[in-house]
């Protein structure tokens, strides 16, 4: 994962609890135990229907994968760009700050048939890296905010934050509960990325 290489072939079927246990092992090994936050994936109804599940999934953010706003990345084939909301939540899981965020995901499955719900969980939802913008104090008005991604003056994505788990506030509530149930570390000022809004944009050279 750290080398952005193709994933190994999955040699057996996993149920979701088994996949989450494997994910924790993978994430700790990849991040040298330095986890920077929690991410949500498969956060809208259409994608859940595709993966034949009735809920979203969660994974870990690698602490060393947080990038500065002015970063330059080498091109990697298959990388996708997702527009998201970043939240800092308190010890009860309520949002206290919000920022725009970009997440880069890299689905590098050896076989397309392995891109299942359990496969996504096992590889930590294809997490690669992420950028978090300027923080602002939380307000319920952000539940109906929109995000826009612009590339070379053209709009590449424009979507409502409500597309991911019905908006940031509900996303925080669900992620806090799900993370606690799945054994993720939680505390005051935990970072959440609440899931893709709009389409995942293929990264291009330039």
Regions found by a protein language model. Name each.
Residues 186-203:
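Conserved metal-binding segment of the jelly-roll/cupin
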Residues 1-173, 177, 181-182, 202-205:
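Catalytic-core "active-site belt" of small-molecule-metabolizing enzymes
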């Amino acid at each position: 994962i750290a080398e952005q290489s193709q994933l190994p072939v999955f040699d057996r079927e996993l149920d979701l609890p088994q996949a989450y246990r494997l994910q924790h092992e993978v994430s700790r090994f990849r991040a040298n135990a330095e986890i920077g936050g929690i991410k949500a994936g498969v956060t809208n109804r259409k994608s859940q229907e595709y993966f034949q599940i009735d809920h979203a999934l969660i994974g870990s953010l690698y602490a060393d994968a947080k990038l500065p706003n002015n970063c330059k990345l080498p091109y990697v084939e298959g990388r996708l760009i997702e527009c998201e909301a970043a939240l800092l939540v308190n010890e009860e899981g309520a949002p206290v700050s919000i920022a725009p965020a970009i997440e880069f995901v890299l689905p590098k499955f050896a076989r397309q048939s392995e891109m299942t719900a359990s496969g996504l969980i096992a590889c930590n939802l294809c997490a690669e890296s992420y950028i978090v913008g300027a923080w602002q104090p939380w307000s319920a008005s952000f539940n109906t905010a929109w995000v826009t991604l612009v590339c070379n003056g053209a709009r590449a994505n424009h979507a409502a934050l409500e597309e991911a788990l019905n908006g940031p506030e509900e996303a925080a509530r669900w992620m806090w509960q799900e993370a606690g149930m799945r054994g993720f570390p939680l505390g005051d000022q935990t970072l959440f990325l609440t899931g893709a809004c709009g389409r995942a944009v293929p990264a291009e050279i330039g």
